[in-house]
Amino acid sequence: MKDFEFFAPKTLEEAKGLLHQYKDVPPAIIAGGTDLVIEINDRWEKPDVVIDIKKLKELEYIRVEENTIHIGALSTFTQIENHPFIRSHVRALYKAASQVGSPQIRNLGTIGGNLSTSSVAGDGVSAMTTLDATVVLESVRGTRQMKLTDFFDGEGFKRRNALEADEIMTEVIIDRPDAHSASAFYKLAKRKSLAISVIGGGMAVKVDDAGVCTWASMRGGCIGRYPLHFKQAEEMLVGAPLTMETMEATLPILHDTVYDMARARPSVLYKKESVQGVFKKLFVDILDQLEGGCNE
């Protein structure tokens, strides 16, 4: 391991100042360290400057407001998993948070780190994309908000997302669900814990008083560089009564979309079939919630 300069700012303003000061290096940010420490030990990352932001307690919160939920970037997966409102009302996020790594990893890993790392297999990435999340990025230059999907499409200093070298993700915002909405997440993996997703499927819907779908979001993680958008399947659901029959009618579209996206990969033969099984489980969960079933 090479030597590097290490800083542990106590305030967000101090952290932004350090990021600006060393932006040309550029610095590596560490929070939980569940990704960066491994990358440094394996010599994938060789930073000259490391900024530890774990002391920034001002970024560690979950705030439920009238129409939105605000999650500080330093909120751990354990904190998200154990939050009463998220557990009972935001099932996609609860399920994703509860299946990240192991209890030890969930105690350290943060939602901001998960999204900023932008791993293909990130459970938080799949869930938050499904929920149409917005992220907040801050620097001494100012603050900007963008949809998570736009964040992933950006080309920042690491070319993996829109984050610039002097920026820090401070918050994630999602819509607060109501009685006419539901979300679900299912992680297909080789083991029940300490496993990387094979497919991380996410689904969210809104319906009217008659049970007709007014909005749908369907995403498949670990299929492409970022969660695959099943846009054609969503369009089939919107305007139709949300029943098992109408949802299962989208399965051939899911199959074909995965094949078209990943046909050059050896895993496509497995994933184009298994994605249908993943979403069948999501359909059951969605209907259970809309019909007043158990949210646990």
Curated annotation (Swiss-Prot):
Pathway: Cofactor degradation; nicotinate degradation; 6-hydroxynicotinate from nicotinate: step 1/1. It catalyses: nicotinate + NADP(+) + H2O = 6-hydroxynicotinate + NADPH + H(+). Reversibly inactivated by selenide and sulfide. Not inhibited by cyanide. Its cofactor is FAD. Residues 1-179 form the FAD-binding PCMH-type domain. Keywords: FAD, Flavoprotein, NADP, Oxidoreductase. Heterooctamer of NDHM, NDHL, NDHS and NDHF. Dimer of heterotetramers. This is Nicotinate dehydrogenase FAD-subunit. It comes from Eubacterium barkeri (Clostridium barkeri). The lineage of its organism: Bacteria, Bacillati, Bacillota, Clostridia, Eubacteriales. The gene is ndhF.
